[in-house]
């Protein structure tokens, strides 16, 4: 524990003469650990961080419009790779895994123990919009791998822009089952149950990128390093995310 504190302190104890005001784009489904990391970073450095949350596709479109900001944190490596291909990031790093799971409300789970049973049921499904959020593509791939893609697609009644929005639909009963993140399902495990995922279901990587547009590259690198530090990763795993392999 002392070693962990020492590592974190080394990352965060460099203070600027004038506090930096950083801008971070972050996937909406990552908000809980991000808020904890930002709070500690601000407390220990005196710098400030403004966070713009949204679906990973949404924040990518936003950045491509304004071309300003310091860091970009997405629920899937794909979005940061796109920025890398356009020379908008000069450093990227994987933090944890963002795993899609099929979560079913406990009051609707009776008789549903497989994707076959789900495909034959009358349950209403929700998934993420693959153009807007990281887990949307994972949901589509999960359906394909299940062998019941058409039947499952026919049951979709909503495609959400963020995983947070999708979780609300599930908890409010607007849908009976939804492909959400493992971390979100873990937090409401008293209300939902999970189906075993088909073999090959993609495990997205929560990835951070340091933007070339940063006005404070030194301080942005500091925050980048903290996200990837043992303490930063712990904030994510404490919320149900899985360590990167």
From Swiss-Prot:
The keyword Transport is assigned to this record: yes
UniProt xrefs under InterPro entries: ModA, ModA/WtpA
Keyword Metal-binding part of the UniProt annotation: yes
Gene3D superfamilies linked to this entry: Periplasmic binding protein-like II
GO-annotated biological processes: molybdate ion transport
One Pfam match: SBP_bac_11
Keywords: Metal-binding, Periplasm, Signal, Transport
Main location: periplasm
NCBIfam families given in the database record: modA
Function: Probably involved in the binding-dependent system.
Family indicated by similarity: Belongs to the bacterial solute-binding protein ModA family.
Name of this chain's protein: Putative binding protein HI_1525
């Amino acid at each position: 524990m002392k070693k962990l504190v020492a590592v974190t302190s080394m990352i965060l104890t460099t203070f600027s003469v004038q506090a930096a005001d950083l801008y971070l784009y972050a996937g909406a489904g990552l908000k809980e650990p991000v808020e904890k990391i930002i709070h500690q970073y601000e407390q220990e450095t005196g710098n400030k961080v403004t966070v713009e949350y949204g679906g990973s596709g949404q924040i990518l479109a936003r950045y491509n419009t304004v071309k300003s900001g310091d860091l970009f944190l997405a629920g899937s490596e794909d979005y940061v790779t796109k920025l890398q291909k356009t020379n908008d990031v000069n450093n990227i790093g994987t933090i944890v895994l963002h795993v899609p799971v099929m979560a079913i409300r406990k009051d609707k789970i009776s008789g549903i123990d497989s994707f076959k049973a789900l495909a034959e049921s009358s349950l209403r499904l929700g998934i993420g919009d693959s153009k807007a959020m990281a887990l949307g593509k994972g949901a589509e791939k999960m359906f394909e791998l299940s062998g019941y893609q058409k039947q499952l697609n026919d049951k979709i009644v909503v495609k959400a822009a963020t995983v947070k929005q999708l979780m609300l639909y599930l908890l409010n009963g607007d849908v009976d089952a939804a492909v959400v993140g493992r971390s979100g399902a873990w937090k409401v495990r008293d209300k939902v149950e999970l189906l075993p995922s088909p073999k090959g279901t993609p495990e997205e990587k929560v990835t951070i990128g340091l933007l070339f547009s940063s006005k404070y590259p030194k301080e942005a690198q500091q925050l980048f390093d903290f996200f990837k530090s043992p303490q930063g990763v712990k904030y994510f795993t404490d919320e149900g995310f899985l360590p990167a392999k």
